[in-house]
Amino acid sequence: MDTDFVSGTYYNADRRTPGGTYYLYYKQRDQVLRPAPNPDGSYDYESPVDYWMPFNGGIGLHDADWRWKFGGSIYLYSGSHGCINLPVSFAGKFYESIEAGCPIVCFYR
């Protein structure tokens, strides 16, 4: 299996997907992804996803129905907050094929 995807925003160190070898913690359906809350309890964003597969703290693979394009150099300036954004058409198939403990290798070329 392979697909184009969008990783963390490369030119923003706080949003770059960290390189390294990780292992899938678990997988869950129908989650809402949020950053740490602001002092007033609100969130800067809330992203509902159908497929959530975390591998490094709050960083994981998930579907991204708000994106219409994947791959290429999008990650340089318009990447994610650190997660791997997958096309909806691919995310479900990938979710069904991966299990907790599966190695995840992240790197930039």
Predicted feature residues:
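Exported/periplasmic cell-wall-interacting domains
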Residues: 16-19, 28-109
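Cell wall/extracellular polymer interaction/catalysis modules
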Residues: 1-27, 51
